[in-house]
Amino acid sequence: MVPSLDASVLKRTEDNILDLMCLMLETRDVRDIPESTTAAVSDVTFQRLSAFLSYHFGDPDLAPEHAANSLRVSPRYVHKVFQIHGTTFGRELLRLRLREADRLLRSSSVRSSSPVPIAEIAYSCGFCSQSHFAVRYKEYYGMTPSERRLGGSHLAKVD
Protein backbone atom coordinates (compact mmCIF):
# COMPACT_ATOMS: atom_id res chain seq x y z
CA MET A 1 0.00 0.00 0.00
CA VAL A 2 1.32 3.46 -0.95
CA PRO A 3 1.25 6.00 1.87
CA SER A 4 -0.62 9.20 1.07
CA LEU A 5 1.52 12.28 0.53
CA ASP A 6 0.58 15.74 1.67
CA ALA A 7 -0.17 18.42 -0.93
CA SER A 8 3.14 20.26 -0.50
CA VAL A 9 5.15 17.08 -1.19
CA LEU A 10 3.04 16.35 -4.26
CA LYS A 11 3.49 19.93 -5.53
CA ARG A 12 7.28 19.79 -5.06
CA THR A 13 7.40 16.42 -6.80
CA GLU A 14 5.35 17.77 -9.70
CA ASP A 15 7.63 20.81 -9.98
CA ASN A 16 10.73 18.62 -9.93
CA ILE A 17 9.37 16.36 -12.66
CA LEU A 18 8.48 19.37 -14.82
CA ASP A 19 11.92 20.88 -14.24
CA LEU A 20 13.56 17.62 -15.29
CA MET A 21 11.39 17.41 -18.40
CA CYS A 22 12.26 21.00 -19.32
CA LEU A 23 15.93 20.28 -18.82
CA MET A 24 15.61 17.16 -20.94
CA LEU A 25 13.99 19.15 -23.73
CA GLU A 26 16.78 21.69 -23.65
CA THR A 27 19.62 19.17 -23.74
CA ARG A 28 18.34 16.39 -26.00
CA ASP A 29 17.64 16.23 -29.66
CA VAL A 30 13.96 17.13 -29.86
CA ARG A 31 13.47 14.53 -32.63
CA ASP A 32 13.98 11.79 -30.01
CA ILE A 33 11.11 13.02 -27.83
CA PRO A 34 7.46 12.30 -28.68
CA GLU A 35 5.63 15.40 -29.88
CA SER A 36 2.89 14.92 -27.28
CA THR A 37 5.50 15.14 -24.51
CA THR A 38 7.07 18.34 -25.84
CA ALA A 39 3.62 19.91 -26.31
CA ALA A 40 2.55 19.01 -22.77
CA VAL A 41 5.76 20.37 -21.24
CA SER A 42 5.48 23.52 -23.36
CA ASP A 43 1.88 24.06 -22.21
CA VAL A 44 2.77 23.59 -18.54
CA THR A 45 5.81 25.83 -18.89
CA PHE A 46 3.67 28.49 -20.58
CA GLN A 47 1.20 28.33 -17.68
CA ARG A 48 4.05 28.69 -15.19
CA LEU A 49 5.53 31.61 -17.15
CA SER A 50 2.12 33.28 -17.33
CA ALA A 51 1.72 32.91 -13.57
CA PHE A 52 5.20 34.33 -13.03
CA LEU A 53 4.38 37.35 -15.23
CA SER A 54 1.03 37.87 -13.50
CA TYR A 55 2.81 38.07 -10.17
CA HIS A 56 5.83 40.18 -11.25
CA PHE A 57 4.54 42.45 -14.05
CA GLY A 58 4.87 45.54 -11.83
CA ASP A 59 8.66 45.21 -11.80
CA PRO A 60 9.95 47.74 -14.36
CA ASP A 61 13.19 45.75 -14.76
CA LEU A 62 11.49 42.41 -15.42
CA ALA A 63 13.26 40.47 -18.16
CA PRO A 64 13.07 36.98 -19.67
CA GLU A 65 16.18 36.05 -17.69
CA HIS A 66 14.30 36.61 -14.43
CA ALA A 67 11.53 34.25 -15.49
CA ALA A 68 14.07 31.71 -16.73
CA ASN A 69 15.95 31.78 -13.42
CA SER A 70 12.73 31.40 -11.46
CA LEU A 71 11.57 28.41 -13.50
CA ARG A 72 15.11 26.99 -13.83
CA VAL A 73 15.06 26.97 -17.61
CA SER A 74 17.15 28.87 -20.13
CA PRO A 75 16.15 32.31 -21.44
CA ARG A 76 16.18 30.75 -24.91
CA TYR A 77 13.57 28.21 -23.81
CA VAL A 78 11.41 31.01 -22.36
CA HIS A 79 11.42 32.73 -25.76
CA LYS A 80 10.70 29.43 -27.52
CA VAL A 81 7.69 28.66 -25.30
CA PHE A 82 6.16 32.09 -25.95
CA GLN A 83 6.83 31.68 -29.68
CA ILE A 84 5.04 28.30 -29.67
CA HIS A 85 2.05 30.04 -28.11
CA GLY A 86 2.01 32.81 -30.71
CA THR A 87 3.37 35.66 -28.63
CA THR A 88 6.55 36.99 -27.07
CA PHE A 89 7.65 37.61 -23.50
CA GLY A 90 7.54 41.37 -24.09
CA ARG A 91 4.12 41.34 -25.75
CA GLU A 92 2.59 39.26 -22.95
CA LEU A 93 4.19 41.46 -20.29
CA LEU A 94 2.86 44.61 -21.98
CA ARG A 95 -0.62 43.07 -22.27
CA LEU A 96 -0.70 42.27 -18.54
CA ARG A 97 0.56 45.73 -17.59
CA LEU A 98 -1.98 47.48 -19.79
CA ARG A 99 -4.89 45.34 -18.58
CA GLU A 100 -4.06 46.10 -14.94
CA ALA A 101 -3.61 49.80 -15.71
CA ASP A 102 -6.97 49.82 -17.49
CA ARG A 103 -8.62 48.13 -14.51
CA LEU A 104 -7.09 50.72 -12.16
CA LEU A 105 -8.15 53.61 -14.39
CA ARG A 106 -11.73 52.33 -14.51
CA SER A 107 -11.87 51.78 -10.75
CA SER A 108 -10.38 55.19 -10.00
CA SER A 109 -12.55 57.49 -12.07
CA VAL A 110 -12.48 61.27 -11.87
CA ARG A 111 -15.83 61.10 -10.09
CA SER A 112 -14.33 59.24 -7.13
CA SER A 113 -13.35 61.26 -4.08
CA SER A 114 -9.61 60.71 -4.55
CA PRO A 115 -8.65 59.36 -7.98
CA VAL A 116 -5.22 57.75 -8.19
CA PRO A 117 -2.90 59.88 -10.34
CA ILE A 118 -2.27 58.40 -13.79
CA ALA A 119 1.50 58.55 -13.20
CA GLU A 120 1.09 56.44 -10.07
CA ILE A 121 -0.94 53.86 -12.01
CA ALA A 122 1.72 53.77 -14.72
CA TYR A 123 4.57 53.21 -12.27
CA SER A 124 2.65 50.61 -10.24
CA CYS A 125 2.09 48.61 -13.43
CA GLY A 126 5.79 48.54 -14.31
CA PHE A 127 6.07 51.43 -16.76
CA CYS A 128 9.18 53.58 -16.40
CA SER A 129 7.50 56.81 -17.48
CA GLN A 130 4.01 58.22 -17.74
CA SER A 131 4.57 59.30 -21.34
CA HIS A 132 5.65 55.81 -22.45
CA PHE A 133 2.61 54.39 -20.66
CA ALA A 134 0.26 56.88 -22.37
CA VAL A 135 1.66 56.07 -25.83
CA ARG A 136 1.39 52.30 -25.33
CA TYR A 137 -2.06 52.60 -23.75
CA LYS A 138 -3.38 54.59 -26.70
CA GLU A 139 -1.86 52.12 -29.18
CA TYR A 140 -3.56 49.23 -27.39
CA TYR A 141 -6.93 50.72 -26.40
CA GLY A 142 -7.39 53.49 -28.97
CA MET A 143 -7.75 56.22 -26.34
CA THR A 144 -5.54 57.95 -23.82
CA PRO A 145 -5.55 57.03 -20.14
CA SER A 146 -7.22 60.39 -19.42
CA GLU A 147 -10.00 59.65 -21.91
CA ARG A 148 -10.54 56.24 -20.29
CA ARG A 149 -10.74 57.83 -16.87
CA LEU A 150 -13.35 60.29 -18.15
CA GLY A 151 -15.57 57.37 -19.13
CA GLY A 152 -14.50 56.46 -22.64
CA SER A 153 -15.41 52.80 -22.22
CA HIS A 154 -17.45 52.77 -25.43
CA LEU A 155 -14.22 53.34 -27.40
CA ALA A 156 -12.09 50.77 -25.64
CA LYS A 157 -10.71 47.56 -27.03
CA VAL A 158 -12.22 44.57 -25.28
CA ASP A 159 -9.75 41.96 -24.04
Regions found by a protein language model. Name each.
Residues A134:
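DNA-recognition helix of C2H2 zinc fingers
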